[in-house]
């Protein structure tokens, strides 16, 4: 009888892949609830059934994919709830504090559950660049969002300066050789360069950030002219061209005085003075080669 009821229950799971509610089970199966509970508990122990906690505090049940059943085998109700909360966080991940607030579990219990889920490769921890590289948790096969990883310009959640300098050099050279290009041209060219060099594909946001940096460096200029864009067959009217006039350098800004927040109250005989300034002393003690004139 239990095997027959189990098969009926699984058939019902196939019919409702998003989850079975308690009411649906009672109406569809028509057996005593004690018998159904035994079947449910047995399927959960086997890793064939997942328990889902709904927002209205009711419980649903969902069949686990055959390839994942070994990973879910033996998990308890608390494990499933934390897994469900992490699943709901999608590619942005969930903080341990969020898991604690949503579940009501103690931190020690959550830490233990997270270790269990990680060891079974159901979830993974990812360092976020947004909040001091704190860990967030997401499903094991989930690709973290750009807000978490920083995109392709970051390597192991750290700014990849060497890679960025190389890409900036390619942008400058490309614009110098072409004379005038739009962002689509740069994206096409830079994606090809990036894939050949690292087998990685840069996103439009990454490339736009690189282009902006090259502009700030004074190596290229942005032209906003819809007429010029129309002549060259560009829709946006925003083009990038080589910089004709180098941006002048103000060497006063290289000195501590140029960026000093207390410059206005500094005087020879005052409490703040060049004689007492630690930063000015360090600046004067530099070698000539290290001074940027």
UniProtKB/Swiss-Prot annotation:
Q: Which residues form the signal peptide?
A: none
Highest taxon of the lineage: Eukaryota
One GO cellular component term, please give it.
RNA polymerase III complex
Q: Which GO terms describe its molecular function?
A: DNA-directed RNA polymerase activity
Keywords assigned: DNA-directed RNA polymerase, Nucleus, Transcription
- A Pfam family it matches: RNA_pol_Rpc34
Q: Where in the cell is it found?
A: Nucleus
Q: What does this protein do?
A: DNA-dependent RNA polymerase catalyzes the transcription of DNA into RNA using the four ribonucleoside triphosphates as substrates. Specific peripheric component of RNA polymerase III which synthesizes small RNAs, such as 5S rRNA and tRNAs. May direct RNA Pol III binding to the TFIIIB-DNA complex.
Share what the entry says about its subunit structure, partners included: Component of the RNA polymerase III (Pol III) complex.
Protein family according to the UniProt entry = Belongs to the eukaryotic RPC34/RPC39 RNA polymerase subunit family.
Q: What is this protein called?
A: DNA-directed RNA polymerase III subunit rpc6
Record gene name: polr3f
